[in-house]
């Protein structure tokens, strides 16, 4: 029996995570938040004082990637991320850990180490995977491929609201600069750069609500699954 796969790719702050969780809940599919994998690995390497010395400690970093124990659960259209059984959902969502993830993602050997971990999420009845290279590198066979984007300014505004909701005091100018820096790094990296798959359904969410984007996605996915 074929496992249905839905991929959602796009830049940081475009709403991928929220919409991936909603789609997984809607269809009763498993969920993969690939960005969380990189954030978790980045945080782990930081704690081990390896993140700033990736080249000389590469074998140890690769082993850490292979051994990561992570689980994703969906609850009320939200994602709960467990690391070694501990809920780290909020911990890994800071801008600092996002920078850790971007550094990890730029290392080909670490991307390779996480490749099979991501492929292992293919399980019946289906999978919703969100990230930056889900359709182009990890799940090219996906039946439904979505590329979700938004202007850097609108993504910065959303991120500020999210962080303020977590009780953090942040400046939109700092968040915008961070987003623009990550976009540049993600788009220019040599391995699996951020770009839409040639057959992806592209959505710009700059002026759309979550519910409006979700409905567009469901309409598209229903057609792909029926086909």
Curated annotation (Swiss-Prot):
Taxonomic source organism? Acinetobacter baylyi (strain ATCC 33305 / BD413 / ADP1)
The record's listing under Pfam families reads: Cytidylate_kin
Family statement drawn from the similarity comment of this UniProt entry: Belongs to the cytidylate kinase family. Type 1 subfamily.
GO biological process per UniProt: nucleobase-containing small molecule interconversion; pyrimidine nucleotide metabolic process
What positions does the entry give for ATP binding?
Answer: 10-18
Any stretches that span the bilayer, and where are they? none
Keyword Transferase carried by entry: yes
* Record CDD domains: CMPK
Intracellular or extracellular location(s):
Cytoplasm
Q: Gene Ontology terms, cellular component aspect?
A: cytosol
Give a GO molecular function annotation for the protein: CMP kinase activity
Stored InterPro entries: Cytidylate_kin, Cytidylate_kinase_dom, P-loop_NTPase
| The protein's name | Cytidylate kinase
Q: What is its EC number?
A: 2.7.4.25
Cite the SUPFAM superfamilies for this sequence: P-loop containing nucleoside triphosphate hydrolases (SSF52540)
Q: Which UniProt keywords apply?
A: ATP-binding, Cytoplasm, Kinase, Nucleotide-binding, Transferase
């Amino acid at each position: 029996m074929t496992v249905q796969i839905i991929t959602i790719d796009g830049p940081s702050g475009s709403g991928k995570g929220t919409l991936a969780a909603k789609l997984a809940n809607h269809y009763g599919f498993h969920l993969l938040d690939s960005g969380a994998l990189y954030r978790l690995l980045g945080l782990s390497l930081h704690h081990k004082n390896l993140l700033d010395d990736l080249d000389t400690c590469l074998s140890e970093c690769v082993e850490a990637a292979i051994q990561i124990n992570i689980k994703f659960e969906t609850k009320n259209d939200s994602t709960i991320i467990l690391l070694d059984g501990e809920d780290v959902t909020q911990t890994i969502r800071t801008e600092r850990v996002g920078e850790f993830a971007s550094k990890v993602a730029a290392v080909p050997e670490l991307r390779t180490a996480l490749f099979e971990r991501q492929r292992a999420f293919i399980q019946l009845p289906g999978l919703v995977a969100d990230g930056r290279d889900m359709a182009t590198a990890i799940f090219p066979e996906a039946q439904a491929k979505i590329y979700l984007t938004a202007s850097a300014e609108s993504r910065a505004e959303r991120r500020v609201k999210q962080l303020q909701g977590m009780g953090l005091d942040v400046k939109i100018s700092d968040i915008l600069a961070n987003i623009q820096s990550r976009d540049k790094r993600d788009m220019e990296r040599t391995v699996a750069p951020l770009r839409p798959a040639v057959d992806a359904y592209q959505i710009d969410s700059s002026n759309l609500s979550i519910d409006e984007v979700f409905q567009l996605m469901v309409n598209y996915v229903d057609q792909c699954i029926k086909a």
